Regions:
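Amphipathic alpha-helical packing segments from all-alpha helical-bundle domains
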Residues: 8, 32, 36-39, 45, ...
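Hydrophobic core segments within long, regular secondary-structure runs in both alpha-
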Residues: 23-27, 65, 69, 113-121
Length: 132
């Protein structure tokens, strides 16, 4: 579990808290995490999908769900999108980053990033209109 926690801590250390930094973060982090964590992700997935260790993996990811939801709650007032919408967007982003780090699948990464960009723009417009 330490390895998984370390990777997540590294990821959260560079996570933006300023909306102006989100675009840079989204562009850079998939490549950064592939270089820094690719081997660790592959090892972790091998270990935590084994029947012997699956419960440890489930427990870790329960905590991930809580931590990412808390991060989304901190972003909500800054970007004006409810945390209940931000949280699944974070999950999609992280999944795309992990997939890229493990397999260096540029097509998968870019298609996920494109839908995230469009989704965030649509949600931002929707919630700005609701506030007006």
């Amino acid at each position: 579990a330490y390895c998984m926690e370390k990777v997540e801590d590294d990821f959260m250390e560079v996570a933006p808290t300023d909306p102006k930094d989100v675009v840079r973060f989204v562009k850079e982090v998939p490549y950064w995490t592939a270089q820094k964590h690719g081997k660790k992700y592959r090892l972790m997935y091998q270990v935590y999908t084994l029947p012997k260790y699956i419960e440890h993996g489930k427990k870790f990811f329960e905590g991930v769900n809580e931590r990412y939801t808390e991060y989304a709650k901190r972003l909500e007032p800054k970007i004006g999108i409810p945390y209940t919408v931000i949280t699944p967007l974070i999950f999609i982003f992280v999944r795309a980053c992990v997939h890229y780090a493990m397999f260096e699948d540029e097509y998968y990464l870019q298609t996920q990033m494109e839908v995230l960009k469009q989704g965030v723009a649509l949600f931002a417009d929707k919630y700005k209109a609701n506030q007006a």
